[in-house]
Amino acid sequence: MKKTMDGNEAAAYASYAFTEVAAIYPITPSSPMAELTDKWAANGKKNIFGQPVKLVEMQSECGAVSAMHGALDTGAIATSYTASQGLMLMIPTMYRIAGQLKPGVIHVASRNVATHAITINAEQSDVMACRQTGFAFLASGSVQEAMDLSAVAH
């Protein structure tokens, strides 16, 4: 299938196929991944297991990663989507997930971490802040790689 899409849509497309539970809290620039997953789940689109993804929209990034952790504890294949400050708020739960050897996937649209103003510039300080959590990190250099590595991560 040939289709023009951006990295968010590519990652969402591949991750939806392999996900049973998606815990979301939309945050720019990763919002399109969560919004597409929400749309597809609401329309009953099936994953590779023949089921629509169960989507849980939470009140914060902490809630999203905690819901993902809970889904992983039940044996579900779970994912979440985030960026920048949202990812850093997930760090305490990331330690628990990695320490329990749970195979969750967090898709990150990396951007600059701002202290005093909003920024949408790309950089990896948000991801680098999570290196010590025990999570493995895969980074794409193109839209095609975003889709491929999304599938590989699952």
Segment roles from a protein language model:
Residues 1-129, 134, 151:
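Thiamine diphosphate
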Residues 137-154:
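Structural signature of the thiamine diphosphate
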